[in-house]
Structures are given as C-alpha cells and as structure tokens.
Amino acid sequence: MVTPQSPTPMFNGLDDDLYSDAKYAHEINDKMRVPKRIKATGEYSNEDLLLSNQNGMISSWNYHDKIDMNVPDRIVVLGHNQHLETRSAPREIQLENSILPKNPSVGLVRVQTPPRIITLTDQHFPSASEESSPIRANGHHLYGNDLDEDADDEEVHATQYVRANGVARMGFQGNDTNSVESDSQLTTGSASKRSQLNQQQHNNLDASMLAHREGTPMGELTPHEEILYLRRQLAKLNRRVLNIEINNEQRTQREKIVYCLGLAYFVLKTIFWLNRN
C-alpha cells in the first residue's frame, strides 16, 4: 500500500519509451490501414457490409468485388477510355531480371570492381615522351616555309593572314579543315603572331592527349586515341597542302609581275624604236 510517507518511485525513462513506441506503432498501423469501403463522397468504413438480394438474403459470392479494394500492380491504358489491370511487372523489369539475376552468386557481380593496381602494360596512359611545343629552341614560332620542315610536330598550327583592308582570316580552322585563303592580296601582319599564340593554347590539350607512351603499337590504341591520331594526320596534310597553295599563289604573283615588267619593257623599246625611225 502506498502512503504519503512512502518514498516516491524514481523516474525510469526506459519503460516510458517502450510504452510510447508501442503506442506509436499501433497508431501508425491504424492510420495506414486501407479501408474496405470508400464512397464517392469521401466517406469510408471498415465494416463488413454485405449487399442483399431481392429476397432480403445476403449473398457472399460478390463480396470481394464490391467491398474489398484490389490494388493492381500494373494498369495498362488501352485507349478509348479502356484500361487493363494486371499483376505482372513491367517489361523493362522483366528484361532486366532475365539478364541480371536478382540474387547473384559470389562469383557473379553486376558491376566490375576496378583494379587496385594499374600497370602500364594493361592500361593506356599518355606520357610526356613526345614534344608538343610548337616553339623552336631559339624562341621563334613556325611560319612560312618552316611549316613544311616541322610537319611532324605534335602541335597543329593555324597560319593567319590579314587582308589589305585589315580583315583577318584563318587559313586553317578546326571547324573547316579545307578552308584555304586564296585571295590575291594576302599579307602577313602582326595579328598573326597573337593568333598563333591563342591557337597554340587551344590545341595544347588535344596534342597532350594524343601523345601515347613509347613502344605502343598502333593496334593497341583506344578509339579515342585513334580519332585524335587521325585528326593529327589530317591536320598535317592540310597544313602541307596549305603551304603548297600559298607558295603557288606567291609564285603566280611573281610571274605576273615579271610578265608585266617584261611586256612593258618590250613595249617601251618598240615605241622608242618607232620614234627614232
């Protein structure tokens, strides 16, 4: 018997926690339970209400169809306000389960584990074996005829020319590998040096990625490295063709000047000879 003089029991939070957890779980179960019947007005009930027939007798053959809620796993829209309820999983999940088992064994894994040690004999890594600098040892850039001599360098050079009216045009651009400036009044200017430096910084990345390790045969290159290698070869060919066309254009200009001077000389000599006679 507890009296006012009896010592008060000490507070024990463990019992209260157990009691509150059990009460919380019971309330959650009651709240998350799906009702057996929901009306169109929003009212619902869990009573087992059976529908009676014309004679007042209750039949249970349509109990599950009219009272219980059957939630299908999949609803397929057929069109024309029609749908199909199925219990099967979607085709994507069925295909994935047919290829990849749900419970793989120890030796079968879905994702390959990356190796802890990577060796150069098995993996492709770029190296600094090939020089990618387009600048000579004396510090001068490559222009004019030096392009033909240094065609094997890693860097792809874009020679820029300036028209007589000051409009700059690129002889070789990344988006148009066959663009060649064949105007008759092309002169190199100071803007070409600045454009060379900008183009050099832009192409350093591709040149560094293209450099592969020493001793790697061409058959072992990855597709990305092969694409970069083909781009470099096309750039070299385009550079040589550009240099040849520039030389041909300059030679044509020189021949025109020589022909004009020679024709003017013979015309003047003819006029002087006629005047003398």
Swiss-Prot record:
The modification Phosphothreonine is found at residues 177, 216, 222. The keyword Metal-binding does not apply. Residues 275-277 are lumenal. Belongs to the Tango11 family. This is Transport and Golgi organization protein 11. GO terms for cellular component: cytoplasm; endoplasmic reticulum; endoplasmic reticulum membrane; mitochondrial outer membrane; peroxisome. It comes from the Eukaryota. It is a single-pass type IV membrane protein. It is found in: Endoplasmic reticulum membrane; Mitochondrion outer membrane; Peroxisome. Keywords: Coiled coil, Endoplasmic reticulum, Membrane, Mitochondrion, Mitochondrion outer membrane, Peroxisome, Phosphoprotein, Transmembrane, Transmembrane helix. Residues 174-200 have a biased composition (Polar residues). May play a role in mitochondrial and peroxisomal fission. The modification Phosphoserine is found at residues 127, 129, 132-133, 179, 182, 190. Residues 225-253 form a coiled coil. It holds the Pfam family Miff. Residues 1-256 are cytoplasmic. GO terms for biological process: mitochondrial fission; peroxisome fission; protein secretion. The chain crosses the membrane at residues 257-274. Residues 124-148, 167-200 are annotated as: Disordered.
